[in-house]
Design a protein with these regions (language model features):
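N-terminal leader/capping segments at the start of a protein or of a new domain
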Residues: 1-56
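Short hydrophobic interaction/assembly module
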Residues: 44-74
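Ligand-binding loop in jelly-roll beta-barrel domains
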Residues: 65-66, 74, 128, 135, ...
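Conserved short histidine dyad/triad with adjacent acidic residue
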Residues: 69-114, 148-150
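A short beta-strand-loop-beta hairpin characteristic of the jelly-roll/cupin
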Residues: 106-139
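Residue-level marker of beta-strand positions
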Residues: 142-143
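Conserved small/polar residues in nucleotide/adenosyl-binding loops
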Residues: 172-174
């Protein structure tokens, strides 16, 4: 994957600031999450040379911040017991500082809930979005606006599913 980040030089002219792979990734053994860019709610200084994605990968953005990321969901092999899936999911969420987001995993081990509005596009694959009381099958280029609900993603295909997401920290009112 190639990531191109633009900015300005000290004359105010537009330039390419970064051109290369994502600075950080995690969990390639179970799919993978690749940080493309983050904001922290502060002013954007487009002349700096700081790679905003080159920091520890945490699921949710900070107050006023955003996360722009690419993630991959691998198919689940047949016959994996639920207790093993619960353990794998718990470990994966702990690695991204999100164990506390797993509020109710009875329906699926990867169920989680964040205080974010997420814009997600399925690029490749056959994925089901699981909610507490609903499920919807997604095809490439389907778009989900995920408004702080308890949810999980399941790959129904034989090869990795590829998704892109923007997460925005938000107060969610029910």
């Amino acid at each position: 994957m190639r990531r191109i980040i633009t900015g300005h030089n000290n004359k105010g002219e537009s330039i390419i600031s970064f051109d290369g792979p994502p600075a950080r990734s995690i969990g390639e053994d179970v799919g993978g999450l690749f940080e493309l860019w983050n904001t922290d709610g502060d002013d954007v200084i487009s002349t700096d040379e700081i790679d905003r994605a080159d920091e520890d990968i945490i699921l949710s953005p900070p107050n006023g911040g955003t996360k722009f990321r690419y993630f991959q969901i691998n198919p689940i092999p047949d016959g994996v017991p639920d207790d093993v899936m619960q353990e794998i999911a718990a470990d994966a969420f702990e690695k991204i500082g999100a164990g506390h987001h797993r509020v109710d995993t009875r329906k699926h081990p990867a169920m989680h809930k964040t205080e974010t509005i997420d814009y997600i596009i399925l690029l490749k694959g056959d994925v089901t979005l699981i909610l507490d009381n609903d499920e919807v099958n997604l095809k490439p280029f389907d778009v989900v606006v995920q408004r702080g609900t308890n949810h999980a993603w399941v790959n129904n295909g034989d090869e990795p599913a590829l998704l892109i997401a923007v997460l925005i920290l938000s107060l969610i009112h029910i």
